[in-house]
Amino acid sequence: MKTAYKQLLRHLLLLVAVLALGACSTAPVQQGDAVIEPSFSADRVLDDDLAYLSDEISDPWEGFNRSMYRFNYRFDKYVFLPVVNGYKAITPDFLEQGIHNFFLNIEDITTFINSILQLSPTKTVQTTGRFLVNTTVGLLGFIDVASRLDIPKHDEDFGQTLGYWGVGNGPFLVLPVLGPSNVRDGVGLGVDWYTLNEIRDELDMKDSEKWALTIMKGIDTRANVAFRYYETGSPFEYDWVKLLYTTKRKMDIEK
């Protein structure tokens, strides 16, 4: 755990250098819908330490990933964020928080399953307690009673479970709309989605209800993420995101 934090600190310090260089370089330029990125990459101007970006993070599909990154930027700007901003404008704060709590409560289902698969009795018991308390006393999770009772919240997914059992990252991958990932985490995302979908089927939910929940979950998730594409002012934003995502996931698995 301490090693992971030291690595993150080291990478963050390197990223400060990246951003400083970016301030003196040509940042991505937006021309209408187009985003023109500099033709050079971070590993040409930084020292050997930042070769981690290309040497340790496998990115054989970089061309596709960068194209998808730009697609996500446009989708975010012209579709996702306008919807999110409209949602936040018409939804009272207390209701918005309640909806967020509701989806966090649903996530405890996959956290419970993955805690078992990771042989973690403490996380399993605590997550079970949170889910039972919030689902009953907390009115299906709209009120986070468990946190008021100091029951810790954990976040575990199948990608972390695969990592726990020694499965490597695989190549870096930028998913449509969802953003940075890798092959292992992409598979994990699919397994977690399938698990929740099976539960919805057991509850006899209609397809329209499933889609409504999925869309609402997406809006809620984006509303709670502060990141905005191409606002770093750095020409190395793609590399920056790739490094931070990979380091964070390593920490998630090791915690």
Task: List the predicted regions and their residue ranges.
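Long intrinsically disordered, low-complexity regulatory segments
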Residues: 1, 21-25
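Bacterial N-terminal signal peptides that target proteins for export
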Residues: 2-13
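Bacterial N-terminal signal peptides
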Residues: 11-22
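N-terminal targeting leaders of membrane proteins
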Residues: 24-104, 108-119, 209-255
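Short low-complexity stretches enriched in small and charged residues
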Residues: 62, 128-132, 195-199
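Mid-length scaffold segments of soluble, non-membrane domains
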Residues: 101-180
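Surface-exposed interaction patches
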Residues: 145-148, 161, 166-254
